[in-house]
Every structure is written in structure tokens, then in C-alpha cells.
């Protein structure tokens, strides 16, 4: 396994984008959040994903937040940048026109809304990977895209030298199991589901890109590291401790719950951009109780 792939094993964190009360980006809080997850034992960062509310950022804000995350990280960990589109040519142009110096790879989501066929998905990602100067990690999340990438399609794409892995967020465990059992070791299998991640890792996956690890990187990293070391008992102990929190932060959707948790930790304001809204008083109270006791 090459050096980059080995660095992308373990716990990646799907980073939030902090906002101020006036909905502008809180660049100072980006530094606080980055320091928090790194000190908690995260292995790498993922910016401009779903959790980062990327669809609400202007192009100028995307450029500035990229710079801010890179500066805050200060070369301590690899950083993956999220870039996706339901227009293949637009995505290729966007990748090649963007300054991505400092990023290790691109996380690219399955095209959404227009629901391509499996052959369309294969052609889309093949063309993107062949045109990209950076390695591509596929991202399958059918609950958001309304399009599932079949594991046999992923297997075909894994033969492309510039496609180095997949974040698999299909809740059907048989899908990630197929990939674990049929891909080569130089293709990363990354869970995209906080709740089942340790079970996937115990079965042979390489790690997780986690939402919950924004708030509790220490416990989450210990859970995943225990699983990577084959320690089923220890991994399950951490799972039992943090699973109530995982359920809470997804109760009203992501990133509503995790933003509430980060506020309780004093790391940022509990502010989201419309059409997303902050957590209800009831959920905020439950999250506050967990954070104060964990």
C-alpha cells in the first residue's frame, strides 16, 4: 500500500463549516475545529462535503475556506477536498481550474438528480479520473443522490489507477462487504456511516469518514483503531459509549445535530444556512446532556 493510502486509513473527519450569527463564515472557528479534531487523534480531514454545507457556499467562499483549512492544518494531516457535479464536463473544468495545491485527493459524489445508469456512472468517473491531476475517491450516498452505484460498477472503476478508493454510505452492509471481498488492497474501502463503521472495519474496511468525529474525535478514533487492530471487544465498548450520541446528531439531519454539539463544546456558533436550520430546543438539550457527561 502506497504512502498516501496508508495515511488515509483510520478516521477521516467530514469537517463542518462554522458560521457566525450573521451567517458569514467564521474563519477563526475553522482553526479551533481543526485543532480539536487533530488533537483528538483524527487521521485526515475532509472539507467541502455534505457536513460542510458546501451547496450554500459561494465560489469565493469555497476558495477562501480551502485556504483557511489548509492554513489551519499546517501540513499536519492529509486533507481531501469534496468536488462533485451532475455534469461531467463541468466537474472536469472545475477541478482543472481550481487551485488545489496542498490537498491530497478529491472526494467526488455520485451524480445527483439526473439518476444516470450504471454505465453512465462508469463513464462519468472514468472521464473525471483520467482528466484529474489528483487521485479520486468515489462517494456513494444514495440517500442523498437518489442513485446507488452498484458494487460491480465500483469494482470496474477500481481498476483505474487514479481512482484510489470509495466512501461507501449505502446502509446495505452487503454492498460494502462485496467491495471488501473483491477489491485489491490498493483500493481504499471507507465507511460513510458512523453507526456501522466499526463493524465494517472489523470486516476488513480501511476506516471511516465520520461526522461525529467533529465533536468526539478521541472516542471515535479509539473505536476505529480498536477495530483496525482486530479488537472486537474494545471496539464494541467504544461503540456502546458513543452510539447514543451518533443517534442524536442524526435525529434532525446532518449537519444540524453536529453543529449543535460543536456549539456545546464552545467551538462554533449553532448556525446553519437556509434551507437548513438549527436544532430544536429538545434535541439541543439532549446533545447538551451528552456533551456535559461524556
PLM region spans:
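Short Asp/Glu-rich motifs
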Residues: 56-57, 91, 117-118, 148, ...
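Glycine-rich phosphate-binding "P-loop"
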Residues: 140, 162-163, 273-274
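Alpha-helical structural signal in soluble globular domains
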Residues: 40, 64, 68-73, 97, ...
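Active-site beta->alpha loop and helix N-cap motifs at the rims of alpha/beta catalytic domains
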Residues: 2-13, 17-146
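Catalytic alpha/beta core domains of metabolic enzymes, predominantly
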Residues: 144-250
Amino acid at each position: 500500500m502506497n504512502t498516501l493510502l496508508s495515511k488515509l486509513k483510520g478516521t477521516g473527519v467530514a469537517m463542518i463549516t462554522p458560521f457566525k450569527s450573521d451567517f458569514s463564515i467564521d474563519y477563526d472557528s475553522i482553526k479551533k475545529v481543526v485543532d480539536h479534531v487533530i488533537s483528538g487523534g483524527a487521521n485526515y480531514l475532509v472539507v467541502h462535503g455534505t457536513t460542510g454545507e458546501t451547496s450554500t457556499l459561494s465560489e469565493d467562499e469555497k476558495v477562501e475556506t480551502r485556504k483557511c483549512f489548509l492554513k489551519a492544518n499546517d501540513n499536519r494531516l492529509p486533507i481531501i477536498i469534496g468536488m462533485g457535479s451532475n455534469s461531467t464536463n463541468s466537474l472536469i473544468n472545475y477541478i482543472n481550474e481550481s487551485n488545489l495545491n496542498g490537498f491530497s485527493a478529491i472526494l467526488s459524489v455520485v451524480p445527483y438528480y439526473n439518476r444516470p445508469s450504471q454505465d453512465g456512472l462508469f463513464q462519468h468517473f472514468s472521464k473525471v479520473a483520467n482528466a484529474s491531476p489528483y487521485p479520486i475517491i468515489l462517494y456513494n450516498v444514495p440517500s442523498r443522490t437518489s442513485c446507488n452505484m452498484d458494487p460491480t460498477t465500483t469494482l470496474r472503476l477500481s481498476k483505474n489507477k487514479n481512482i484510489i478508493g470509495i466512501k461507501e454510505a449505502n446502509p446495505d452492509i452487503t454492498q460494502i462487504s462485496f467491495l471488501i471481498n473483491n477489491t485489491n488492497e490498493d483500493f481504499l474501502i471507507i465507511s460513510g456511516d458512523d453507526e456501522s463503521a466499526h463493524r465494517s472495519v472489523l470486516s476488513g474496511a480501511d476506516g471511516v469518514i465520520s461526522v461525529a468525529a467533529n465533536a468526539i474525535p478521541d472516542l471515535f478514533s479509539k473505536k476505529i483503531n480498536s477495530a483496525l487492530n482486530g479488537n472486537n471487544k474494545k471496539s464494541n465498548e467504544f461503540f456502546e459509549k458513543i452510539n447514543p450520541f451518533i443517534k442524536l446528531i442524526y435525529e434532525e439531519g446532518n449537519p444540524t445535530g453536529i453543529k449543535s454539539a460543536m456549539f456545546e463544546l464552545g467551538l462554533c456558533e449553532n448556525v446553519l444556512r437556509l434551507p437548513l436550520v438549527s436544532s430544536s430546543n429538545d434535541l439541543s438539550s439532549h446533545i447538551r446532556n451528552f456533551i456535559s457527561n461524556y
